[in-house]
Amino acid sequence: GPGISDAEAGSSFEEVTRKNNGGDFFNVNNYEADLEKAKELLAEAGYPNGEGFPIIEYMTNDAGYNKPVAEYLQSAWKDLGITMDIKIVEWSTFTPTRRAGDFEICRGGWVYDYDDPSNMLNLLASTSGNNDGKYSNPEVDKLLEEARSTADKAEHYEKLHAAENLIMEDAAVSPLVYSSDFYLQNPKLKGTWHSPYGYWYFMYATMEE
């Protein structure tokens, strides 16, 4: 699917990340649950056992697994003594509210519509209309512009990897899941096409007897 545009045949975007960054962004050993360490860091920040930490609000829409995810996050923060309120709104309200940046923490998602990492990273450019969190880092903007303007493929990906490193260091977003599509198809249905981007095409579909 998308996300392998700078990978050699037979490899994946994870392998490219290891090659260009010296390792994965996500290291299981570094990110295993460590409640005591989290409490220690919270105390160092001036909030022992979460005391004095302001109540935070997580906004999400009311579809699918979004509510269970919100409830899990609420439970995880509760273990640190942090209170998280869940604000569930209908999609018609959720989208414009998120677009306006009127939230503390908010669920987000994106489906690639062209096969290049810039499709995801450009969302976090300060001038992007899809930058709902209003994240702004001039160095990230500079790297994204350099990636966009170069005709050299290797340099293009080098700039994007550098921008991604900064974005992750800033914790501009906190990736939770990569979603997958599951489907059943009648073997009599022929001529359909399912693109790597999740779109179904039925213009040439036929149903055999």
What residue spans do the PLM features occupy?
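Short, polar/charged alpha-helical segment
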Residues: 67-80
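Active-site-proximal beta-strand/loop segments in catalytic clefts of secreted hydrolases
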Residues: 59-61, 89, 109-111, 177-180
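Acidic-aromatic pocket-rim loops
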Residues: 8-15, 92-149, 195-196, 201-203
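Long beta-strand-rich cores associated with HINT superfamily self-processing modules
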Residues: 183-209
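Structural transition elements
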Residues: 1-44, 63-67
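Short, well-ordered beta-strand elements
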Residues: 53-62, 84-86
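Extracytoplasmic/peripheral linker and loop segments enriched in polar/acidic and small residues
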Residues: 1-4, 26-32, 83-94, 119-187, ...
